Curated annotation (Swiss-Prot):
It holds the Pfam family ACCA. Keywords: ATP-binding, Cytoplasm, Fatty acid biosynthesis, Fatty acid metabolism, Lipid biosynthesis, Lipid metabolism, Nucleotide-binding, Transferase. GO terms for cellular component: acetyl-CoA carboxylase complex. Pathway: Lipid metabolism; malonyl-CoA biosynthesis; malonyl-CoA from acetyl-CoA: step 1/1. It is found in: Cytoplasm. This is Acetyl-coenzyme A carboxylase carboxyl transferase subunit alpha. One of its GO terms (molecular function) is acetyl-CoA carboxylase activity. GO terms for biological process: fatty acid biosynthetic process; malonyl-CoA biosynthetic process. Gene3D superfamilies: 2-enoyl-CoA Hydratase, Chain A, domain 1. Belongs to the AccA family. It comes from Azoarcus sp. (strain BH72). It catalyses: N(6)-carboxybiotinyl-L-lysyl-[protein] + acetyl-CoA = N(6)-biotinyl-L-lysyl-[protein] + malonyl-CoA. The gene is accA.
């Protein structure tokens, strides 16, 4: 698949286009230009590395939304085996914006839950652009309780602009579904490993992100509102989104420094969308380490440690002047 370049990546796009043109010439020419192609490839890699080392929060938000970024099912394919998807909330419907089921992680049975966006127009509509309705969160809760019943660790993958704000969703209890999930996850007696893989949008993300270990991919974001939404409220203009992103502290590195996430998972040069397999391998190592840290704890120890962690959010010390 041809890489889609973001606006700030235009210097890389121009270089990659030149490389493609030379490859085309190479195929139809007796002249050997492989050394020139190799030189430009090295230059492109260096330019990409340099550019991504200096991304602004707003640019990171764009990378987190990249249309070719790996989604939950992509990571499931590369990291887990024997995945068996389970459907429905047993109360209303099956929400395709959240996927989940049983699988094996390094041979160990587990439960997987995650937001799922679509690639093409038809799938995006079917997945509701990754915005779950109440039945999606209730499906997630059903799977969590199933995991608890059989003593299985739970892995969740967060990637949503937010919970769906439609009238039907509100009528069916969107806020109650999110709140109930928070309550259930706080007291779940099995290991919970949560990873933000793309967008972590507000309560829609938090509803499957209360865990013993909370991680973020390097170029993912996590915030109470989108930068555009924040800008529209504070400055009455979405054009101030870059300023809002800077102020809100939405990046993995920033949230790690604040103690709100436990680990930042490195991505390949140029972002996870450049190399799904490499991104998945990096995440797999992080998941294995995270599970190792909590897998030996008793159910009561898990809940006690998790509650202590939750109660510590927002804690601060006053220093006398």
């Amino acid at each position: 698949m041809k890489t889609t370049f973001l606006d700030f990546e235009q210097p890389i796009a121009e270089l990659e286009e030149k490389i493609e043109q030379l490859r085309f010439v190479q195929d139809d020419s007796a002249v050997d230009i492989s050394e020139e192609i190799a030189r430009l490839e090295v230059k492109s890699q260096a330019l990409t590395k340099d550019l991504y080392a200096k991304l602004t929060p707003w640019q990171i938000a764009q990378v987190a939304r990249h249309p070719q970024r790996p989604y939950t099912l992509d990571y499931v394919q590369h990291i887990f085996t024997d995945f068996e998807e389970l459907h429905g909330d047993r109360a209303y419907a099956d929400d395709k914006a959240i996927v989940g089921g049983l699988a094996r992680f390094n041979g160990q049975s587990c439960v997987i839950i995650g937001h799922q966006k679509g690639r093409d127009t038809k799938e995006k509509i079917a997945r509701n652009f990754g915005m779950p309705r109440p039945e999606g969160y209730r499906k997630a809760m059903r799977l969590m309780k199933l995991a608890e019943k059989f003593g299985l660790p739970v892995f969740t993958f967060v990637d949503t602009p937010g919970a769906y704000p439609g009238i039907g969703a509100e009528e069916r209890g969107q806020s109650e579904a999110i709140g109930h999930n928070l309550y259930v996850m706080a007291e779940l007696k099995v290991p919970l490993i949560c990873t933000v893989i793309g967008e972590g949008g507000s309560g829609g993300a938090l509803a499957i992100a209360v865990g013993d270990q909370v991680m973020m991919m390097q170029y993912s974001t996590y915030s109470v509102i989108s930068p555009e939404g924040c800008a529209s409220i504070l400055w009455k203009s979405a054009e101030k989104a870059s300023e809002a992103a800077e102020t809100m502290g939405i990046t993995a590195a920033r949230l790690k420094s604040l103690g709100l996430v436990d680990k930042v998972v490195n991505e390949p040069v140029g972002g996870a969308h450049r190399d799904h397999r490499a991104a998945a391998q990096s995440l797999k190592r992080a998941l294995a380490e995270a599970l190792r840290q909590v897998d030996t704890l008793s159910p009561s120890e898990l809940v006690e440690q998790r509650m202590e962690k939750l109660m510590g959010y927002g804690r601060f010390k006053e220093i006398a002047a």
